[in-house]
């Protein structure tokens, strides 16, 4: 698994959040294809936007920031151009880098939208009973996944309205209505039938028929 520590400046900033991942070089002029973790790329990826980089310590980009010069779309795929990334070699050195940013202080909160740091640490309730705590948020193209730590292990919960109908950041809680089996073992629907009174009373075979 390709994993690197989150940059220290991001750790110190609880408002920071991930907006994308650089996947691979595109063309010869330093462009890099993007995997987006935001549903509003036109707002996050504007010329001049600055990103902190989550990369290995051995990367030449470790401890540096990246500034966007332009975002283009090729066949419905986002491609970014950045200051200091002038050719394919430089673009390839950024493959798998995760982009973090901090929203402007005057940015208005959107309804039913939360940053990762607002979700991590929330108490998860099911039918009013605490079942775990959110420990991590994973972002995927289809949907986001909440990692919920429970006494029996970590449960991955799809962050969709049908399963997570309510989030109350001020109260520190998140309500789940999970399908059967997500937080517990699915019961055996075909239990072994108990013997009838006649079968229970039948004596054990003797002699050559006994086994």
Curated annotation (Swiss-Prot):
Region annotation (Disordered) ranges: 184-211
Keyword rRNA processing: yes
Gene Ontology cellular component list: cytoplasm; ribosome
Transmembrane segments: none
Chief location bin: cytoplasm
Subunit organization: Binds ribosomal protein uS19.
Protein name per UniProt: Ribosome maturation factor RimM
Species of origin: Clavibacter michiganensis subsp. michiganensis (strain NCPPB 382)
């Amino acid at each position: 698994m390709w994993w690197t520590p989150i940059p220290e400046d991001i750790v110190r900033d609880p408002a920071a959040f991930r907006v994308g991942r650089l996947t691979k070089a595109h063309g010869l002029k330093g462009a890099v294809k993007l995997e987006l973790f935001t549903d509003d790329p036109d707002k996050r990826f504007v010329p001049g936007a600055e990103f902190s980089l989550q990369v290995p310590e051995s990367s030449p980009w470790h401890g540096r920031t990246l500034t966007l010069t332009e975002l283009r779309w090729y066949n419905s795929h986002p491609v970014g151009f950045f200051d200091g990334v002038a050719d394919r070699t430089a673009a390839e050195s950024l493959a798998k880098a995760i982009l973090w940013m901090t929203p402007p202080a005057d940015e208005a909160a959107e309804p039913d939208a939360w940053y990762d740091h607002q979700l991590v640490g929330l108490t998860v309730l099911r039918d009013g009973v605490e079942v775990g705590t959110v420990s991590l948020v994973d972002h995927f193209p289809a949907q986001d996944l909440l990692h919920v730590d429970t006494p029996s292990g970590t449960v991955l919960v799809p962050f969709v309205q049908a399963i997570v109908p309510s989030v109350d950041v001020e109260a520190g809680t998140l309500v789940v209505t999970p399908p059967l089996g997500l937080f517990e073992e699915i019961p055996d629907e075909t239990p072994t039938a108990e013997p009838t009174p006649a079968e229970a009373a039948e004596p054990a075979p003797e002699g050559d028929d006994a086994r």
